[in-house]
């Protein structure tokens, strides 16, 4: 006669507790994700530039030499937004620039920077996006030239200009510098605008943060060569209040970044960003 296994109440509770603990550990922190979403500037690209537009419901236009891209609806609406996505779908989009169906995203979506976001931060961002009120506003289709509509060509572009993978700390750098590097390189994706690009839209990595162009206008050099007249205090105040040391104001695009993103960061994170910019190689404009 076979003996049946006997489970004590303590054993059952232990198994249940362990399963709960594993599940809880995998859940993101929506409150922390809210801060990360500000640091990543999500609202700027995913909210239409008009008064009363629903936040994160898409419609914001991004004009490029390849056509006009529109930020999609990223609210949890199951039809218009990303309500049917899984957490894995979201992480794949951010880390690898791929849609749930496996197709490439165009690199107007800055996954070339977001790929560096650490996985626990991605989970927190996902938890925050799921907590948003859903909007049924449909995403607008991109308006691109015929040749640039072919998503399969992005595979070649990725081979040339995209290296997926989470941020790796700078060896020998201080904790503050590494925190600043993470904010600048990954979440803040500063290089997307402040690094020059070639005719294919690929970033010129040897000129990282040495200045670029947006809408045909020059974007400043953020290396020590471009910031040599700015004190640390000047930089931090600019990122909060939007005023240069000589009393001037930034472009409309940068003013929006300050309003939506950098002014929402903690003083410690702002100081870390400045600390990182100070240790970059000085590159001429």
Summary of predicted features, one role per range:
Residues 137-154:
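Extended, well-folded interaction surfaces typified by the phenylalanyl-tRNA synthetase beta subunit core
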Residues 88, 97, 102-128:
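Membrane-embedded segments
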